[in-house]
Design a protein with these regions (language model features):
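Hydrolase catalytic cores
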Residues: 43-45, 75-79, 169, 232-313
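Secreted peptidase-domain scaffold signal
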Residues: 161, 322-433
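Flexible glycine/proline-rich, aromatic-decorated loop/lid segments
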Residues: 198-203, 231-255, 298, 302, ...
Length: 433
């Protein structure tokens, strides 16, 4: 969002104005076109119908590529390049821009917002990631009643980022406290394929899969809250691509397909896999007429995730498992829902002070602030503690049916391994030493 007004000479519109798809005077018309292919790949990861047949491995064995939730509807929102992320989020979440003010229209246009993009470079933000303007807005969009008394909240899922493997490498929007951040694990589908032939980086046999990828960004968030939340495939797999794709596009090093599919990956793939899983979950909840909010979706996905036996700041709750999440909703045995009563309040307390400096009037938001209600969250954030202070919480475990389940609780201790000091001078807004 620009800090000054600019008026287009041709159409007479101020920058940041939402325009109709077609100008009645014939000066312009809008075209939704994914010229790079990234949006097509992320959408196909979620919604591919799996009807096209491909010879992926050049062995005459035909394959289809099915999305996670093939019956969903995709609402494309142009937000980067010729667009604005903030405007796109607000509109998809059910707000309309009227005379430079955002007015809630009564319900979100999308059940889930999926973000396969991110900014991990501090200087380009001019704010600490997690306390930046976009993170404040994302947090408010997730929480019911934050922007309007009737606002129901929107589930927002984002890539954790590809800046790993160090801790504290997440950027916005994945680092926002109340959104769902998704990191990347390996797949064995691409082993020996095309440009990956002979590469040992992710394992050269099909025995290797579901390992956390080196580039997957790690937590924690800037206030110390646990991130990421979930993991899914990000290195790598196949997706349908645009029908305008030329032979060899998006592939190098030999073995490039002549058909309209591509190798895709990164946490840009992980996020839509989780978003598709959330869509299946929403479908199940609606079929059973069960009430839910973004925190219920988050807790169901995290409670049903498969533990990959990494620390929480690397893997979150673990590998997303849509089937087990739906099984909890349907009351099947073997899985349970877990959440605590302190995380939401502790996060809110930590971000309330920087949030108070945010001038929402500049963005046309009259009712800005985080709801005073509390919401259960699976992961635990103990708050900001001074030396010698303690914190506690109460975890609630919900069995989805009447059959007994066995639960094992294993305490773990985190300890300092080594203390290092780095000397250097940081140039503000430019680079770190």
């Amino acid at each position: 969002i620009s800090d000054k007004a600019e008026i287009d000479d041709k159409i007479g519109a101020v920058n940041g104005t939402l325009l109709p798809a077609m100008d009645k005077n014939g000066n312009y018309f809008g075209v939704m076109n994914d010229f790079f292919g990234h949006g097509t790949a992320t959408s196909a990861t979620i919604a591919s119908k799996g009807k096209m047949v491909y010879d992926i491995y050049n062995d005459t064995k035909k394959s289809t590529i099915l999305g996670i939730a093939p019956d969903v509807s995709i609402l494309p929102v142009k937000s980067l390049w010729f667009g604005d992320v903030f405007y796109g989020w607000m509109w998809a979440a059910g707000f309309e821009n009227e005379e430079s003010k955002w007015v809630y229209a009564g319900e979100p246009k999308a059940d889930i917002i999926s973000n396969s993009w991110g900014v991990s470079n501090f200087p380009s933000l001019e704010y600490v990631p997690g306390l930046d303007i976009s993170s404040h807005i994302l947090n408010a969009l997730v929480i019911p009643q934050s922007l309007h008394q009737n606002y129901t909240g929107t589930t927002i899922i984002s890539s954790s980022g590809n800046s790993g493997h160090g801790y504290g490498t997440m950027g916005m929007p994945g680092i926002s406290s109340f959104g769902i951040a998704v990191g990347a694990v390996t797949s064995n589908d691409f082993v020996g394929y095309g440009p990956f032939k002979g590469q040992p980086r992710f394992g050269n046999t099909t025995d290797h899969s579901d390992h956390v990828v080196d580039f997957s960004s790690r937590g924690p968030g800037v206030i110390g809250d646990p991130k990421p939340d979930l993991m899914s495939i990000g290195a790598y797999s196949f997706v349908p691509s645009a029908i305008t794709k030329l032979p060899g596009d998006g592939c190098s090093g030999g073995g490039c397909p002549n058909e309209s599919f591509s190798v895709f990956g990164g946490t840009s793939m992980s996020a839509p896999i989780a978003a598709g899983s959330a869509a299946l979950l929403v479908e199940s909840l609606k079929e059973k007429s069960m009430s839910y909010d973004p925190f219920a979706i988050r807790n169901l996905l995290m409670s049903s995730a498969e533990d990959l036996h990494n620390d929480p700041l690397t893997q979150g709750a673990g590998l997303v498992n849509a089937l087990d999440a739906v099984r909890i909703v349907n009351g099947h045995g073997g899985k349970f829902l877990v959440h605590n009563d302190a995380t939401f309040s502790n996060i809110k307390e930590a971000i309330d002070v920087p949030l108070s400096t945010f001038n929402s009037d500049l963005f046309g938001i009259d009712e800005f602030g985080l709801s005073d209600k509390t919401f259960p969250i699976t992961s635990w954030y103990g708050g900001r503690l001074n030396p010698g202070e303690e914190t506690t919480t109460t975890f609630t475990i919900e069995n989805p049916n009447n059959y007994p389940i066995d639960i094992t609780i294993k305490p773990e201790t985190l300890k300092l391994i080594e203390n290092l000091q780095i000397s250097g001078i940081t140039e503000p807004h430019l680079q770190d030493p």
